[in-house]
A protein has these predicted regions:
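Membrane-helix interface motif
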Residues: 155-167
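Hydrophobic transmembrane alpha-helices
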Residues: 2-75
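Hydrophobic alpha-helical transmembrane segments
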Residues: 14, 42-47, 86-90, 113, ...
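Membrane-interface loop-to-helix entry segments
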Residues: 11-15, 109-115, 186
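Hydrophobic cores of alpha-helical transmembrane segments in multi-pass inner/ER membrane proteins
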Residues: 17-23, 116-126, 189-200
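Short helix-perturbing small/polar motifs within transmembrane alpha-helices
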Residues: 114-155
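Alpha-helical membrane segments and adjacent membrane-interface helices in multi-pass membrane proteins
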Residues: 56-119
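C-terminal transmembrane helix-loop-helix hairpin of multi-pass membrane proteins
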Residues: 139-148, 168-225
Length: 225
């Protein structure tokens, strides 16, 4: 999903920076508020960031100028809500661009919007919509949809940048999305399953924290213990 350095036209790269910046600033404020409100959540916050970094660092070949990989942002969105993920995801993408040459600095704004803004919000919508139906299903959908939404947005960004020789945006979008789908749909399903296992584990080792964050009720944590 990470769009490579220099792959977007400068004007479009700047536009995505402009679109993403308010979300990142709001996210930074949300992180500060969260830490002040609940200092004990810092460890889980760091773990969510590490989880996102580890999963999104997995790099599989895909569309020219990009790559396929899990995102891990759905878990952080469930735990801390999307504004926090905008800031965490930005740090993850920045470090990956600098340390791993994964993504790029000029394309950071576009990558932030797809992976740290759009994906988490779509995943969180699934969590809110299905959490009262079945928590495991809600976690699965949140993780999988956060992943898939990221790649839909990335396909859109690439189609805008490269609409094809005839300028057909729709055809270009379909081309990018179909190539991503080959690897990304299986990855999204796998990420959803991993998310279910992760939260089953967290209810056992971090039950009080999940209750305090409002992710699970005390009764749900006790039932899972």
């Amino acid at each position: 999903m990470h769009i490579a350095e220099g792959f977007l036209p400068p004007i479009q790269a700047a536009a995505w920076f402009a679109v993403s910046t308010p979300f990142v600033i709001h996210g930074a404020m949300a992180v500060v508020k969260q830490v002040r409100k609940d200092p004990e959540s810092k460890l889980l916050l760091a773990a969510a960031g590490a989880f996102t970094f580890a999963l999104s660092a997995v790099k599989l070949p895909s569309v020219t100028g990009s790559s396929s990989h899990p995102t891990g942002t759905g878990a952080a969105a469930i735990l801390f809500r999307p504004p926090v993920v905008a800031f965490i995801g930005t740090l993850v993408l920045l470090f990956q661009a600098i340390l791993l040459a994964h993504g790029g600095l000029t394309t950071l704004g576009a990558n932030v919007f797809s992976m740290a803004v759009a994906g988490p919000w779509c995943g969180y919508l699934m969590w809110v919509s299905f959490r009262k139906v079945n928590k495991a299903l809600a976690v699965f959908l949140a993780m999988a949809v956060a992943d898939l939404a990221t790649y839909v947005v990335t396909s859109f960004q690439l189609a805008v940048a490269y609409p094809g020789a005839d300028g057909n945006f729709g055809a270009s979008l379909g081309k990018f999305a179909s190539v991503f789908a080959v690897t990304q749909i299986p990855l999204a399903i796998a990420e959803g399953v991993l998310g279910v296992l992760l939260f089953a584990f967290l209810t056992k080792v971090a039950g009080p924290e999940l209750t305090r964050l409002g992710v699970f009720t005390k009764k749900e944590v006790e039932a899972a213990a």
